[in-house]
């Protein structure tokens, strides 16, 4: 059984990071473009990690199987009807972004960051809402 406090804490991190991204990108603050990019990437990374933590918590506590890697946790959520398969696939890609950002595998493409901010923050919210609804949190 999922732990309510863990789920709520991870959802709060996701919400806070999304709010911070929208705030820093939505109004002039006297920040340089590199500062805005750094704040955005940091908060995307934190939100992605919170989503990973949320998924792995559910997979573990609900005994959905043993994922081969953290990205597979989203697939398992899809297979068990917590989220749909399309959302699971998009969240798996978010893991790839997080890995690049955290491990500096390569330079982060600002166009990818913009795409995530403009088109994929809703995926993180959808995961949070689906988990909360499924488990009555």
What are these regions (language model features)?
Residues 1-137:
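Solvent-exposed interaction patches of small proteins and small membrane subunits
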């Amino acid at each position: 059984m999922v732990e309510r406090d863990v789920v709520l804490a991870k959802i709060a991190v996701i919400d806070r990071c999304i709010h911070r991204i929208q705030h820093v990108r939505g109004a002039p603050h006297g920040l340089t473009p590199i500062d805005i990019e750094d704040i955005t990437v940091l908060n995307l990374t934190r939100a992605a990690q919170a989503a990973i933590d949320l998924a792995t918590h559910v997979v573990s506590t609900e005994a959905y199987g043993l994922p081969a890697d953290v990205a597979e946790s989203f697939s398992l959520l899809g297979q068990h009807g917590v989220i749909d398969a399309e959302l699971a696939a998009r969240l798996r890609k978010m893991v790839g972004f997080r890995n690049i950002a955290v491990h500096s595998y390569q330079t982060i493409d600002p166009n990818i960051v913009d795409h995530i901010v403009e088109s994929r923050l809703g995926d993180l919210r959808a995961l949070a809402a689906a988990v909360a609804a499924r488990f009555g949190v």
